[in-house]
Amino acid sequence: MGACRIQYVLLIFLLIASRWTLVQNTYCQVSQTLSLEDDPGRTFNWTSKAEQCNPGELCQETVLLIKADGTRTVVLASKSCVSQGGEAVTFIQYTAPPGLVAISYSNYCNDSLCNNKDSLASVWRVPETTATSNMSGTRHCPTCVALGSCSSAPSMPCANGTTQCYQGRLEFSGGGMDATVQVKGCTTTIGCRLMAMIDSVGPMTVKETCSYQSFLQPRKAEIGASQMPTSLWVLELLFPLLLLPLTHFP
């Protein structure tokens, strides 16, 4: 009789523990979006379906936005359950205007359906395309932002304050993402640092590679321009010596 009573108590305990585990499981919104948007702050809809997570997992929502002057905006957005990370809200501006802009927002939270941001109005507040009066007349750069690769990259005038042309390729993986984004344009950033040498955005990993030819071309032009007067000066000195064999003395 005592053994049966113990088994009964154990069964009740297991049922309560099982019910407690189910209660503890978190529900999160889940979606992955990769798109080009004209005005993501006003038009992007970030509502998603809900799924039950495994015990101990958190909710996360992460978005990365990249834009060049005169182009649409690339949006990479992810919502999911995650097993790693702690509760935190992060906003990072990797590259600031004028020229190219790259920013991200990330929210890791521990309550059911807490990754519930439905728009980017509070995240994307980038100024409108730079006015023509603020454009530099001396620098032009190929300009495009595209999913995959740029089919065309027209040469566009750069805004005052930009320092170089950027040409880079970003490869994303993780967080349900597997995508490549090509970016070209005027920027204030020096070198291959559109993402400020940061290799992760929320659950996504990032690999940034660049064409350094575009960084070197302006410098090569300057060197060539500085050497030309020297070459002409040397030729001017050598010219009388070259004429000596042709001179006849009486």
From Swiss-Prot:
UniProt keyword annotations, A-Z: Cell membrane, Cytoplasmic vesicle, Glycoprotein, GPI-anchor, Lipoprotein, Membrane, Secreted, Signal
PTM annotation, UniProt: N-glycosylated; by high mannose and/or biantennary complex and/or certain types of hybrid oligosaccharides; possesses different oligosaccharides chains according to its subcellular localization in the testis. Sheds from membrane raft by ACE and released from the cell surface of epididymal sperm while it passes through the caput epididymis leading to disappearance of TEX101 on spermatozoa; is essential to produce fertile spermatozoa.
CDD domains associated with the record: TFP_LU_ECD_TEX101_rpt1, TFP_LU_ECD_TEX101_rpt2
One Gene Ontology term, aspect cellular component: acrosomal membrane
Organism superkingdom: Eukaryota
UniProt keyword annotation of Membrane present: yes
Membrane topology (UniProt): Lipid-anchor; GPI-anchor
One of the GO biological process terms: binding of sperm to zona pellucida
Residue span, UPAR/Ly6 domain: 141-215
Propeptide residue interval(s): 225-250
Residues with attached carbohydrate: 45, 110, 134, 160
Gene knockout outcome: Knockout Tex101 mice are viable and show no overt developmental abnormalities. Males are infertile.
Signal sequence interval, chain numbering: 1-25
Lipidation (GPI-anchor amidated glycine): 224
Tissue: Detected in testis and ovary. Expressed in spermatocytes, spermatids and testicular spermatozoa, but not in spermatogonia or interstitial cells. Expressed abundantly in testicular germ cells (TGCs) but mostly disappeared from epididymal spermatozoa.
Location in the cell: Cell membrane; Membrane raft; Cytoplasmic vesicle, Secretory vesicle, Acrosome; Secreted
Pfam families in the record: UPAR_LY6
Record function comment: Plays a role in fertilization by controlling binding of sperm to zona pellucida and migration of spermatozoa into the oviduct probably through molecule adhesion ADAM3. May play a role in signal transduction and promote protein tyrosine phosphorylation.
Subunit annotation: Interacts with VAMP3. Interacts with LY6K. Interacts with DPEP3; co-localized on the cell surface of spermatocytes, spermatids, and testicular spermatozoa, co-localized only in cytoplasmic droplets of caput and corpus epididymal sperm. Interacts with ADAM3; co-localized on sperm surface. Interacts with ADAM5.
UniProt name for this protein: Testis-expressed protein 101
Encoding gene per record: Tex101
